[in-house]
Protein backbone atom coordinates (compact mmCIF):
# COMPACT_ATOMS: atom_id res chain seq x y z
CA UNK A 1 0.00 0.00 0.00
CA UNK A 2 2.87 2.38 0.91
CA UNK A 3 4.78 1.43 -2.25
CA UNK A 4 1.79 2.19 -4.48
CA UNK A 5 1.27 5.59 -2.87
CA UNK A 6 4.93 6.46 -3.26
CA UNK A 7 4.80 5.54 -6.96
CA UNK A 8 1.97 8.07 -7.43
CA UNK A 9 3.21 11.48 -6.23
CA UNK A 10 -0.11 13.17 -7.04
CA UNK A 11 -1.96 10.91 -4.65
CA UNK A 12 0.68 11.37 -1.95
CA UNK A 13 0.45 15.16 -2.21
CA UNK A 14 -3.32 14.98 -2.00
CA UNK A 15 -3.12 12.85 1.13
CA UNK A 16 -0.64 15.28 2.73
CA UNK A 17 -2.85 18.25 1.85
CA UNK A 18 -5.86 16.50 3.32
CA UNK A 19 -4.01 15.93 6.61
CA UNK A 20 -3.16 19.64 6.79
CA UNK A 21 -6.62 20.85 5.79
CA UNK A 22 -8.58 22.51 8.62
CA UNK A 23 -11.73 20.97 7.17
CA UNK A 24 -10.27 17.49 7.51
CA UNK A 25 -9.17 18.25 11.06
CA UNK A 26 -12.59 19.47 12.16
CA UNK A 27 -14.35 16.60 10.45
CA UNK A 28 -12.17 14.09 12.28
CA UNK A 29 -13.36 15.38 15.65
CA UNK A 30 -16.90 14.60 16.79
CA UNK A 31 -19.21 17.57 17.00
CA UNK A 32 -19.56 19.14 20.41
CA UNK A 33 -22.73 18.34 22.26
CA UNK A 34 -25.48 20.85 21.76
CA UNK A 35 -26.77 22.93 24.64
CA UNK A 36 -25.53 25.68 26.90
CA UNK A 37 -21.79 26.17 26.67
CA UNK A 38 -21.37 24.03 23.56
CA UNK A 39 -18.82 25.31 21.07
CA UNK A 40 -20.19 25.47 17.56
CA UNK A 41 -18.02 25.19 14.48
CA UNK A 42 -18.10 27.44 11.47
CA UNK A 43 -21.27 27.19 9.45
CA UNK A 44 -23.30 25.83 12.38
CA UNK A 45 -26.29 27.93 13.40
CA UNK A 46 -27.25 27.92 17.07
CA UNK A 47 -31.02 27.92 17.53
CA UNK A 48 -32.14 29.44 20.82
CA UNK A 49 -35.13 27.89 22.53
CA UNK A 50 -37.98 29.98 23.94
CA UNK A 51 -37.54 31.00 27.56
CA UNK A 52 -39.82 32.03 30.42
CA UNK A 53 -37.52 34.95 31.26
CA UNK A 54 -39.88 37.75 30.23
CA UNK A 55 -42.88 36.23 31.97
CA UNK A 56 -40.90 35.54 35.14
CA UNK A 57 -39.61 39.12 35.27
CA UNK A 58 -43.18 40.42 35.19
CA UNK A 59 -44.25 37.88 37.81
CA UNK A 60 -41.53 39.16 40.17
CA UNK A 61 -42.98 42.66 39.73
CA UNK A 62 -46.42 41.42 40.72
CA UNK A 63 -47.73 41.58 37.14
CA UNK A 64 -49.72 38.42 36.57
CA UNK A 65 -51.37 36.72 34.72
CA UNK A 66 -49.30 37.14 31.56
CA UNK A 67 -50.52 35.77 28.23
CA UNK A 68 -48.79 34.95 24.98
CA UNK A 69 -50.66 34.89 21.70
CA UNK A 70 -49.99 33.80 18.14
CA UNK A 71 -51.90 32.81 15.03
CA UNK A 72 -51.77 30.14 12.35
CA UNK A 73 -53.03 30.29 8.80
CA UNK A 74 -52.24 33.68 7.30
CA UNK A 75 -50.87 32.25 4.07
CA UNK A 76 -53.34 29.54 2.97
CA UNK A 77 -55.92 29.93 0.23
CA UNK A 78 -58.63 28.23 2.29
CA UNK A 79 -59.83 27.98 5.85
CA UNK A 80 -59.77 30.44 8.72
CA UNK A 81 -56.98 32.21 10.53
CA UNK A 82 -56.80 30.65 13.98
CA UNK A 83 -55.48 32.72 16.90
CA UNK A 84 -54.62 31.40 20.34
CA UNK A 85 -53.83 33.02 23.67
CA UNK A 86 -52.17 31.06 26.48
CA UNK A 87 -51.47 31.75 30.15
CA UNK A 88 -48.87 29.25 31.33
CA UNK A 89 -48.75 28.00 34.91
CA UNK A 90 -45.23 28.97 36.11
CA UNK A 91 -45.06 25.76 38.14
CA UNK A 92 -46.34 23.41 35.43
CA UNK A 93 -44.69 24.47 32.18
CA UNK A 94 -44.64 21.58 29.69
CA UNK A 95 -41.17 20.52 28.64
CA UNK A 96 -40.22 20.93 24.99
CA UNK A 97 -42.19 24.08 24.15
CA UNK A 98 -40.89 25.64 20.95
CA UNK A 99 -42.01 27.50 17.86
CA UNK A 100 -44.62 25.23 16.27
CA UNK A 101 -42.80 25.45 12.93
CA UNK A 102 -39.76 23.74 14.46
CA UNK A 103 -41.78 20.80 15.77
CA UNK A 104 -43.12 17.72 14.05
CA UNK A 105 -46.86 17.08 13.91
CA UNK A 106 -46.47 14.36 16.55
CA UNK A 107 -44.56 16.70 18.87
CA UNK A 108 -47.17 19.44 18.43
CA UNK A 109 -50.03 17.06 19.23
CA UNK A 110 -48.31 15.81 22.39
CA UNK A 111 -47.53 19.33 23.58
CA UNK A 112 -51.05 20.51 22.74
CA UNK A 113 -52.47 17.92 25.14
CA UNK A 114 -50.04 18.99 27.87
CA UNK A 115 -50.90 22.67 27.38
CA UNK A 116 -54.60 21.84 27.64
CA UNK A 117 -54.05 20.13 30.99
CA UNK A 118 -51.79 22.75 32.58
CA UNK A 119 -52.70 26.16 31.12
CA UNK A 120 -55.55 28.57 30.58
CA UNK A 121 -56.08 29.33 26.92
CA UNK A 122 -58.57 30.51 24.34
CA UNK A 123 -58.88 30.26 20.58
CA UNK A 124 -60.58 32.58 18.10
CA UNK A 125 -61.20 32.20 14.37
CA UNK A 126 -61.28 34.79 11.61
CA UNK A 127 -63.41 33.20 8.90
CA UNK A 128 -62.71 33.42 5.16
CA UNK A 129 -65.55 35.95 4.88
CA UNK A 130 -63.91 38.23 7.45
CA UNK A 131 -60.53 37.80 5.76
CA UNK A 132 -62.06 38.86 2.43
CA UNK A 133 -63.78 41.82 4.05
CA UNK A 134 -61.03 43.15 6.32
CA UNK A 135 -57.83 41.79 4.63
CA UNK A 136 -55.64 39.10 6.11
CA UNK A 137 -53.63 41.32 8.47
CA UNK A 138 -56.62 43.02 10.07
CA UNK A 139 -58.50 39.75 10.35
CA UNK A 140 -55.50 38.15 12.07
CA UNK A 141 -55.12 40.99 14.56
CA UNK A 142 -58.86 40.90 15.23
CA UNK A 143 -58.73 37.17 15.97
CA UNK A 144 -55.72 37.62 18.28
CA UNK A 145 -57.57 40.31 20.22
CA UNK A 146 -60.66 38.13 20.53
CA UNK A 147 -58.62 35.20 21.77
CA UNK A 148 -57.08 37.32 24.54
CA UNK A 149 -60.48 38.70 25.53
CA UNK A 150 -61.89 35.17 25.66
CA UNK A 151 -59.37 33.98 28.27
CA UNK A 152 -61.01 32.81 31.51
CA UNK A 153 -58.90 35.34 33.43
CA UNK A 154 -58.02 38.79 32.08
CA UNK A 155 -54.24 39.11 31.63
CA UNK A 156 -52.32 42.12 32.90
CA UNK A 157 -49.71 41.87 30.14
CA UNK A 158 -49.80 40.29 26.69
CA UNK A 159 -46.94 39.20 24.44
CA UNK A 160 -47.89 38.91 20.78
CA UNK A 161 -45.80 37.43 17.99
CA UNK A 162 -44.83 39.84 15.22
CA UNK A 163 -44.55 43.58 14.70
CA UNK A 164 -48.12 44.63 15.45
CA UNK A 165 -49.71 45.12 18.83
CA UNK A 166 -53.34 44.19 19.30
CA UNK A 167 -56.35 45.87 20.89
CA UNK A 168 -56.52 44.54 24.45
CA UNK A 169 -57.30 46.03 27.87
CA UNK A 170 -53.75 45.77 29.21
CA UNK A 171 -50.16 46.34 28.20
CA UNK A 172 -49.33 44.63 24.92
CA UNK A 173 -45.79 43.92 23.77
CA UNK A 174 -45.07 42.85 20.19
CA UNK A 175 -42.07 40.53 19.87
CA UNK A 176 -40.65 39.83 16.41
CA UNK A 177 -39.93 36.13 16.20
CA UNK A 178 -41.67 35.76 19.54
CA UNK A 179 -42.75 32.17 18.95
CA UNK A 180 -39.08 31.22 19.12
CA UNK A 181 -38.22 33.51 22.04
CA UNK A 182 -41.11 33.79 24.49
CA UNK A 183 -42.40 30.58 26.02
CA UNK A 184 -46.04 31.64 26.30
CA UNK A 185 -46.05 32.70 22.64
CA UNK A 186 -44.52 29.36 21.69
CA UNK A 187 -47.33 27.61 23.56
CA UNK A 188 -49.89 29.76 21.73
CA UNK A 189 -48.31 28.93 18.39
CA UNK A 190 -48.74 25.22 19.12
CA UNK A 191 -52.37 25.61 20.19
CA UNK A 192 -53.19 27.69 17.10
CA UNK A 193 -51.42 25.32 14.71
CA UNK A 194 -52.90 22.10 16.09
CA UNK A 195 -56.39 23.60 16.27
CA UNK A 196 -56.22 24.80 12.69
CA UNK A 197 -54.79 21.54 11.38
CA UNK A 198 -57.65 19.64 13.00
CA UNK A 199 -60.18 22.03 11.51
CA UNK A 200 -58.74 21.59 8.04
CA UNK A 201 -59.00 17.82 8.41
CA UNK A 202 -62.68 18.30 9.29
CA UNK A 203 -63.11 20.50 6.22
CA UNK A 204 -61.59 17.76 4.08
CA UNK A 205 -64.61 15.62 4.95
CA UNK A 206 -67.00 18.48 4.24
CA UNK A 207 -65.33 19.32 0.90
CA UNK A 208 -63.62 16.19 -0.46
CA UNK A 209 -61.29 16.43 -3.41
CA UNK A 210 -59.21 19.43 -2.39
CA UNK A 211 -56.83 17.56 -0.08
CA UNK A 212 -57.26 19.92 2.87
CA UNK A 213 -56.19 17.14 5.22
CA UNK A 214 -52.78 17.06 3.51
CA UNK A 215 -51.83 20.65 2.73
CA UNK A 216 -54.12 22.46 5.22
CA UNK A 217 -55.19 24.95 2.55
CA UNK A 218 -51.74 26.17 1.50
CA UNK A 219 -50.99 26.86 -2.15
CA UNK A 220 -49.09 23.67 -2.93
CA UNK A 221 -49.25 22.28 -6.50
CA UNK A 222 -51.80 19.61 -5.52
CA UNK A 223 -54.13 22.23 -4.06
CA UNK A 224 -53.78 24.53 -7.07
CA UNK A 225 -54.55 21.63 -9.40
CA UNK A 226 -57.68 20.72 -7.42
CA UNK A 227 -58.76 24.35 -7.33
CA UNK A 228 -58.39 24.58 -11.09
CA UNK A 229 -60.26 21.33 -11.58
CA UNK A 230 -63.10 21.80 -9.07
CA UNK A 231 -63.34 25.55 -8.64
CA UNK A 232 -63.46 27.30 -5.25
CA UNK A 233 -65.37 25.95 -2.27
CA UNK A 234 -67.14 28.02 0.35
CA UNK A 235 -64.07 27.58 2.53
CA UNK A 236 -61.73 29.35 0.08
CA UNK A 237 -60.69 32.97 0.53
CA UNK A 238 -62.38 34.49 -2.47
CA UNK A 239 -60.01 37.46 -2.94
CA UNK A 240 -56.75 35.49 -3.01
CA UNK A 241 -55.37 35.49 -6.56
CA UNK A 242 -55.46 31.73 -7.34
CA UNK A 243 -59.02 31.56 -6.02
CA UNK A 244 -60.05 34.54 -8.16
CA UNK A 245 -58.60 32.82 -11.24
CA UNK A 246 -60.40 29.56 -10.45
CA UNK A 247 -63.69 31.36 -9.86
CA UNK A 248 -63.48 33.07 -13.22
CA UNK A 249 -62.98 29.70 -14.85
CA UNK A 250 -65.88 28.05 -13.01
CA UNK A 251 -68.67 30.61 -13.37
CA UNK A 252 -71.14 30.82 -11.83
CA UNK A 253 -69.80 30.23 -8.34
CA UNK A 254 -72.61 29.24 -5.96
CA UNK A 255 -72.62 31.31 -2.80
CA UNK A 256 -73.10 28.86 0.08
CA UNK A 257 -73.45 30.09 3.69
CA UNK A 258 -70.49 29.40 5.92
CA UNK A 259 -70.81 26.39 8.23
CA UNK A 260 -71.21 26.82 11.98
CA UNK A 261 -67.75 25.26 12.31
CA UNK A 262 -66.32 28.73 11.82
CA UNK A 263 -68.06 30.55 14.65
CA UNK A 264 -66.21 33.79 15.23
CA UNK A 265 -65.00 32.95 18.74
CA UNK A 266 -64.17 29.62 20.26
CA UNK A 267 -63.52 29.67 23.99
CA UNK A 268 -61.25 26.88 25.16
CA UNK A 269 -60.44 26.24 28.81
CA UNK A 270 -58.79 23.02 29.95
CA UNK A 271 -60.15 20.40 27.56
CA UNK A 272 -63.64 21.82 27.02
CA UNK A 273 -64.51 23.50 23.72
CA UNK A 274 -67.64 25.54 23.16
CA UNK A 275 -68.54 27.30 19.92
CA UNK A 276 -70.31 30.63 20.12
CA UNK A 277 -72.29 31.49 17.00
Swiss-Prot record:
The keyword Isomerase does not apply. One of its GO terms (cellular component) is ribonuclease H2 complex. It is an enzyme of class 3 (hydrolase). Residues 64-252 form the RNase H type-2 domain. GO terms for molecular function: manganese ion binding; RNA binding; RNA-DNA hybrid ribonuclease activity. It catalyses: Endonucleolytic cleavage to 5'-phosphomonoester. InterPro entries: RNase_HII, RNase_HII/HIII, RNase_HII/HIII_dom, RNaseH-like_sf, RNaseH_sf. Residues 1-32 are annotated as: Disordered. Pfam families: RNase_HII. Its cofactor is Mn(2+); Mg(2+). It comes from the Bacteria. Coiled coil: none annotated. A divalent metal cation binds at residues 70-71, 161. The keyword DNA damage does not apply. Its EC number is 3.1.26.4. Endonuclease that specifically degrades the RNA of RNA-DNA hybrids. PANTHER family: RIBONUCLEASE H2 SUBUNIT A (PTHR10954), RIBONUCLEASE HII (PTHR10954:SF18). Belongs to the RNase HII family. This is Ribonuclease HII. It comes from Bradyrhizobium sp. (strain ORS 278).
